[in-house]
Amino acid sequence: MENNKTSYSWLGKFTTVKQECPTCGNESPEYLKECPHCGGLKCNHCDMGDDTACMNCEGE
């Protein structure tokens, strides 16, 4: 199987393959979500809320 970020099951289930957070390097994030400010991915450890800039936003 290829190293895809997301895999789909034909049985109607959606499975997300665990991946490292590109922002903080967390190897086992509970979730990854897109920052509404810069579009970068952030996880449960580095997500400080949508009203706060993330670590990716600091360089912008």
From Swiss-Prot:
Q: What induces it?
A: Expressed in the early phase of the viral replicative cycle. Expression of early genes is repressed by viral Repc (latency) and favored by viral Ner protein.
One annotated Gene Ontology cellular component of this protein: host cell cytoplasm
Where in the cell is the protein located? Host cytoplasm
Which key words tag this protein in UniProt?
Early protein, Host cytoplasm
Identify this protein by name: Uncharacterized protein gp13
